[in-house]
Regions:
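Structural signature of tandem-repeat unit edges
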Residues: 1-3, 13-27, 37-50, 60-83
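Consensus positions within tandem repeat domains that build extended binding/scaffold surfaces
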Residues: 5-10, 29-32, 52-55
Length: 83
């Protein structure tokens, strides 16, 4: 698994946590987790390189401190999503 495609989990309201640490994911597509209103924890591997627009849009329970990251990319994507 190297990519989570565009809108893969769009409006998946029952999704509470995602752990990709044991994958080689390099890309999270546009709106991949948008409107996942129960998502509270997101763990990404250091292989992550690309984040599409609005990856975490309207993920109201997900806050930057809940994101386990090895670089700042997930936090930047989150901050762009909530604007």
């Amino acid at each position: 698994l190297t990519k989570i495609g565009d809108a893969s989990f769009y409006y998946c309201s029952s999704l509470e946590e995602v752990d990709l640490l044991h994958t080689k994911v390099q890309e999270l597509g546009e709106n991949a987790f948008a409107h996942c209103t129960s998502l509270r924890e997101m763990k990404v591997p250091d292989s992550l390189q690309t984040l599409g627009e609005a990856v975490f849009y309207r993920c109201s329970k997900l806050v930057p401190s809940d994101i386990n990251v090895y670089d700042n990319k997930a936090i930047v994507a989150y901050l762009r999503s909530i604007q």
